[in-house]
C-alpha cells in the first residue's frame, strides 16, 4: 500500500475524531421537538390510571409567563362559574394550580400545560390537585395545602438553577409531596442544583401519605446534584410496586429504571448506599450500553 494511502486514511481518522459530538446544550435545545404530543399519555412502566376525559378543553401551549398567568386565570373563572351553577355541593376536581411570584395564586380546572415559562427571573410552579372547592379566586388560596394530585405526567423537562448559592437558597427542583399518586416522570434532565427530586416531604405527615406516592421514574438524566439525587422520601408510604427495578431505600413505591446518575452525591447511610450500589451494578450488568447511549437519547 502506498504512503499516500496511509496519509489519506490517517487524515480521515483525524477528521472523524475531531467531528463535534452531540452535547447537552444541543440536547437541551431539542427538548420541545422530542417531547410527547398533546394527545399522548404516559406508558412508562405503568400507564396513568385514567386518560383525559373527552369533555376537557383542548390543551394550550404557552411560552411566556404573562400569557400563562392570564390563561390560567381566565379558565379558573370560567370553571368556577360553571361548577357553582351545576353542582354547588359536589366534590369538584381542580386539575392544576399555578403560583407565580409576585403574582397571587391561581387555580384552574381542566387545563393542560405543555411548555412552561423558562424565565429564571420568575418562579412558575404547577401543583395539580384534585380536591378544591372552587368559589372565587380570592378564596381559592385558602385551599392551597390540600395537594392530593394524581394522574400527573412530567415529560421532557430541563430543570436546573445554579450551584453558586448554599444548599438552602433553593428548594427542590421536582418534589412530589402531599399524598400525590400515580405520577410519572420521564425523559427529564435534572442538573446543577443542590436538592434535586424528593418524594414525600416530612415524617410528620405519614398518615396523609400512607398508601399514596406511587411514582415512576424512567429515562431521566441527573447530573451535578448534591442531594436528593435519587427518589428519596421520609413519608410513611406503603410499597405496592411490582416492577422490575424498585428503589428500596425508603418505603415509597418509586420505580427507578434506565436513569443515569453522573457527578451526583448520594446522602444516605452506608448500609442503604451499599444496597443502592448493588442494585445499580445489577442494572448496568444487564444493560451494559446504557451509559454510552442514554445521554443522547434521554431528551
UniProtKB/Swiss-Prot annotation:
Residues 1-18 form the signal peptide. Residues 82-105, 227-246 are annotated as: Disordered. Pfam families: Pectate_lyase_4. It is an enzyme of class 4 (lyase). GO terms for cellular component: extracellular region. Residues 82-91, 232-246 have a biased composition (Low complexity). The keyword Lyase applies. The keyword Signal applies. It catalyses: Eliminative cleavage of (1->4)-alpha-D-galacturonan methyl ester to give oligosaccharides with 4-deoxy-6-O-methyl-alpha-D-galact-4-enuronosyl groups at their non-reducing ends. Keywords: Lyase, Secreted, Signal. GO terms for molecular function: pectate lyase activity; pectin lyase activity. Its EC number is 4.2.2.10. InterPro entries: Pec_lyase, Pectin_lyas_fold, Pectin_lyase_fold/virulence, PEL. It is found in: Secreted. Its main location: secreted. Belongs to the polysaccharide lyase 1 family. This is Pectin lyase. It comes from Peyronellaea pinodes. The gene is PELA.
Amino acid at each position: 500500500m502506498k504512503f499516500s494511502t496511509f496519509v489519506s486514511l490517517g487524515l480521515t481518522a483525524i477528521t472523524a475524531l475531531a467531528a463535534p459530538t452531540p452535547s447537552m446544550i444541543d440536547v437541551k435545545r431539542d427538548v420541545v421537538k422530542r417531547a410527547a404530543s398533546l394527545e399522548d399519555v404516559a406508558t412508562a412502566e405503568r400507564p396513568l390510571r385514567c386518560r383525559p376525559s373527552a369533555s376537557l378543553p383542548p390543551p394550550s401551549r404557552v411560552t411566556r409567563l404573562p400569557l400563562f398567568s392570564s390563561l390560567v386565570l381566565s379558565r379558573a373563572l370560567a370553571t368556577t362559574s360553571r361548577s357553582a351553577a351545576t353542582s354547588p355541593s359536589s366534590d369538584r376536581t381542580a386539575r392544576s394550580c399555578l403560583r407565580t411570584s409576585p403574582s397571587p395564586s391561581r387555580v384552574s380546572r381542566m387545563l393542560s400545560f405543555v411548555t412552561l415559562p423558562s424565565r429564571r427571573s420568575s418562579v412558575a410552579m404547577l401543583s395539580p390537585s384534585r380536591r378544591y372547592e372552587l368559589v372565587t379566586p380570592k378564596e381559592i388560596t385558602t385551599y392551597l395545602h390540600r395537594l392530593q394530585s394524581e394522574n400527573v405526567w412530567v415529560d421532557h423537562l430541563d430543570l436546573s438553577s445554579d450551584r453558586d448559592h448554599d444548599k438552602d437558597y433553593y428548594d427542590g427542583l421536582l418534589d412530589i409531596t402531599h399524598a400525590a399518586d400515580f405520577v410519572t416522570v420521564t425523559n427529564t434532565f435534572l442538573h446543577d442544583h443542590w436538592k434535586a427530586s424528593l418524594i414525600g416531604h416530612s415524617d410528620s405527615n405519614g398518615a396523609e401519605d400512607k398508601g399514596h406516592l406511587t411514582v415512576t421514574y424512567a429515562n431521566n438524566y441527573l447530573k451535578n446534584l448534591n442531594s436528593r439525587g435519587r427518589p428519596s422520601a421520609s413519608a410513611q408510604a406503603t410499597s405496592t410496586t411490582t416492577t422490575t427495578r424498585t428503589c428500596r431505600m425508603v418505603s415509597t413505591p418509586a420505580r427507578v429504571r434506565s436513569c443515569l446518575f453522573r457527578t451526583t452525591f448520594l446522602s444516605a447511610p452506608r448500609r442503604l448506599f451499599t444496597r443502592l450500589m448493588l442494585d445499580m451494578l445489577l442494572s448496568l450488568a444487564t444493560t451494559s450500553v446504557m451509559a454510552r447511549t442514554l445521554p443522547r437519547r434521554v431528551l
